[in-house]
Amino acid sequence: NVSRGLAQRLRALNRFIDDIYNRQKILAEDVVPAELVLTSPNFRAECVGMKPAQSAWANICGTDLVRDSAGHFFVLEDNLRVPSGVSYMIENREVTKRVLPELFYDHSILPVDDYPSRLFEMLASLAPRERKRPNIVVLTPGIYNSAYFEHAYLAREMGVELVEGGDLIVSEDNYVQMNTVDGPVRVDVIYRRINEEYLDPEVFEKDSLLSLIHISSPRDKHR
């Protein structure tokens, strides 16, 4: 029930975001005050009219759950921007299985070690062109980021490249490419671990050195 409820919640959040940046019906009907949304520093006017793949604005959500003394679950918050921490969960499970294996003998505990493969499948489903194995990259701010271990861990476990902004370029025909020793290679999907305000200095934070100029152009052209 918890799993189904969280999936339903994420679908609702995605539909809310899609409505905010497109029809804005929820604002017109005053379900949510328009002023509250449109004046929010987190509202991105650049995203108005966008249609992401499969209408999924948030493909990954880190929902914090708490349970009260009566055993009822409550959502503390939904981390939709750049959720972090899953690698520590996986590593913690591995350590627990080795140190306290008896905990797993008599309890039905769902596995978590398949997360990287499921993450890869989800990212691959978003590729704009059909390929047997889409070219996916994990975009990291770099080694000084507090979650860099996770960025490297997930890239390694998925078998994809870990890149920084300087490793990517936008071609003249508006495709994102990755610099390699053999020349530029087209990128199909970017799993970004960078807040959106640092993505493109021409569109968002002008002093950002973490990503690359024009990365928003392929997005605008649905590439």
Each model region followed by its residue ranges:
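ATP-dependent carboxylate activation and anion-phosphoryl transfer catalytic cores
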Residues: 1-211
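Single conserved hydrophobic/aromatic residue that forms the stacking wall/gate
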Residues: 213-214, 218-223
